[in-house]
């Protein structure tokens, strides 16, 4: 008889635990959602992500145009020169970047005489070479790729965080609902006991009802936040389907440091600033402030100082050296200061990234240790429930004591599952710091 009662009690308790809160956790109202489904919704409907990709695409197109010839057209339909009407004129200018040191400029002008019968084309072509030009800065294609990856990883981390928060709160709601049922059963049993003072039980029951109401409010807020984040406006209530794995990883700091340094846009920018500052300082020391340029000009129908001796085609080559009369020691000191500041900024960036890496690695290790601890607690809770079953069969404990132990087991199981979720989030934080693609790696720990 006791075995049948105990089995019925256990089944009833599991139903209470799994049923969850009456408003937000019934299967008829909750919509199951997996991480893959949530990520698909986020990347399809997130406006900020779409605008970011659009901006990146436009930046890439503009950078590509910087390497192409630039053509400028100008027209002057009418004008007055020296009190006389001037005919219409027009010009087309061309600028062609030819690399680090060369630049080609050309202009073709077309005008009409007073009778607007004869076309007078004129033009010029200029080729410039700078002997002491600084090297061009490296393309920002890699930087743009890192920024896109950072944007994707941020969305993945936000999605995981929202799902985990909601999952934990739903589990807590089920725990507290089951605890409320337990207190109600305890109060009912107390009322059947003669002269039993149930004042504390009634206080606990009221307090538990208030706790459950607060959890309901928090659940509603989390559901609204998740719906807005996913771009869903139908007011659906979600039930995250999350299963996490604990990976056996060798977290070698030196290898991870290389990944972190290589994937940090801020560190790459700091390195570029230091390289530029050192180049400017080296150039100043080498040239002592002189700038040397060579240029060649080819002119068509350009009027010279003596119109009678003007030729249809004229050309000129020149070498120009310029120097700004400014105290050289001050210039050198300014450049040395800029290089020292850039070097200090780089060292600070590396130190900050290394501190973040060590914190992230320690977070993963601590979370892994917590999973192990919660696993031990779960095993102890399972052993406690088995012991309670044997004690109940021997008539040593009551049904309520068995129910209380079953509640402790459910709490230990949820704590163990939540510790694995925390571990997954800490590992994702570490991978994000290393610049890895979380869109695919996330399913290695969450499925």
What are the functions of these language-model segments?
Residues 61, 68, 153, 160, ...:
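Residue-level recognition of alpha-helical coiled-coils
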Residues 40, 44-50, 57-72, 84, ...:
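A glycine-/polar-enriched beta->alpha junction
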